[in-house]
Amino acid sequence: MDHRLLEIIACPVCNGKLYYSQDKQELICKLDSLAFPLRDGIPVLLETEARPLALEESHS
């Protein structure tokens, strides 16, 4: 994941900051407790493709 891209993209739901999870290959929005997948290194920033984070995931 290109860190320059991470600086300019935002959560499509709340426009909040996204955090990269390298081990899960996801972009995390802590405000909405959503995880957006990366497919072939490309962020899929669609709310319908996001998975809800478990409570323990959203606080880490």
Curated annotation (Swiss-Prot):
Cellular-component GO terms for this entry: cytosol
Domain of life of the organism encoding this protein: Bacteria
InterPro entries named among the record's database cross-references: Trm112-like (IPR005651)
Homology family: Belongs to the UPF0434 family.
HAMAP family reported for this sequence: UPF0434 (MF_01187)
Protein name: UPF0434 protein KPN78578_09190
Species whose genome carries this gene: Klebsiella pneumoniae subsp. pneumoniae (strain ATCC 700721 / MGH 78578)
